[in-house]
Curated annotation (Swiss-Prot):
Signal peptide: none
GO MF entries: ABC-type vitamin B12 transporter activity; catalytic activity
SUPFAM superfamilies for the chain: Class I glutamine amidotransferase-like, P-loop containing nucleoside triphosphate hydrolases
Active site (record annotation): C330, H436
Species this chain originates from: Methanococcus maripaludis (strain C5 / ATCC BAA-1333)
Domain of life per record: Archaea
Keyword Phosphoprotein: no
Pathway: Cofactor biosynthesis; adenosylcobalamin biosynthesis
A biological process term (GO) from this entry: cobalamin biosynthetic process
The name this protein goes by in its record: Probable cobyric acid synthase
Keyword Transit peptide: no
Amino acid sequence: MAKFIMVVGTSSNSGKTVLVSGICRMLSNKGYKVAPFKSQNMSLNSRVSIEDGEIAVAQYTQAMAARSEPSVHFNPILLKPKGNFVSQVIVHGIPYEDRDYNEYRSKKDDFLDKIKQSINYLDKNYDYVVIEGAGSCCEINLLKDDIANLRVAEIAGADAILVSDIDRGGVFASIYGTVQLLPENWRNLLKGFVINKFRGNIDVLKDGFEKIEELTKIPVIGTILYDETLILPEEDSQALEGKRVFGNVKSPIEVNIVKFSKIANFTDVDPLSSDCLMKYIDFNDDITGDILILPGTRCSTVEMDLMKKHGLDKKILEFVENGGIVLGICGGYQTLGKMLIDEDFSEGDIGTISGLGLFDMETTFGNEKAIKNSTGTISIFDQNFNVTGYELHEGHSVSNETPLISLSRGFGNCGDSYDGSFKIIGNSYIFGTYFHGILENFEFRNYLVNFVRHKKNLSKIENDNYAEIFNENMDKLSKLVEESLDLSKIIK
């Protein structure tokens, strides 16, 4: 039987996701078989599990931290917002149906049964299960229908830790208010408080620790210092609010990423950030980079319509005329074609719309969703690159261009043996693919960066290995968590 631990928060962005990752890596380093778990997550950022099912990217990342194969049981319910208060409901990795909040709530007991199935599976197959809550664990207007927080701890028999972000201010009031508003049976599950993102001398907090422990009879088990050197994947698009420039600010290579209105899987671009200056651009902005990335999106037709309305489509075509490099990923790839055909309005209110026309390609929506871990070979250069990625798309594309990838596993453009498209227009190279994670492939990423460096008469570089950087930072996070928290009463 597994030991269950739960991390809940006083608010969204309190540090639950990162703390779970750190605990998972810490336990893995001690030789335990560890699983992360989040009963219900709402996110447009998702990845593909070992079973070819869809789970939130946060639980995938936590699985990597735990050194465990990512499973649909790590995130049994995934909600992907579609707009107008409707979300696509993913159950155990498979699209279930679209529901608004009231429709979803009416089936709460059915979804809770699925959550219990996953808890039972994890209990039998792991030594430790580290559960992440959602948002605030005490939204009193939602408590009776909350299947993502302390109800889950109660079902699993988990000891719970309450984390709060001191960087926002009001940390002790947030902790005390949360505890007081919780029903007694859930309050009794709390075994300790964690203060997150503290800057300065911890001694100034001692009076606060003593008072909050006196009032609640629950100890503060640690304070995590704010560490700006940690490089960790972001969980969802909220992290992009106000984010404009990141990556290697001293790099002579600039990458522009179109900040789509319904951007998804934006972490696809992260592997470039160690060697390139990364900059998000809005629909009204000029393109100033050497490489332009059109990322994934929940609604390709909506993004295409917005690009036309704001004139970004013309700027992209001008960028190509001037020899720029373009990479479209999933929804971004679809916009590079001639037509996006959505006769059933499955993508939204736009329907059928013409694309950028850089590829001789048509994409049709309304088909069954492709959810695959995929592999293949890129053979368009003077050498072959073996690549891996994952597919999450409902549109099927028929392209008359040179395929980017010859598939050995996957769905690709339309269920044939190929994925993506490649085209040279003058001095411009245009790449398109359904492979999320394409830039995690070292050889392809290295070729792309050095191709730009060659065009700018710069010497070649060997990129950092993205997987190595991830593991180095997870080990650093694990050490920070272990040194900051007293988990002796929870981890036995």
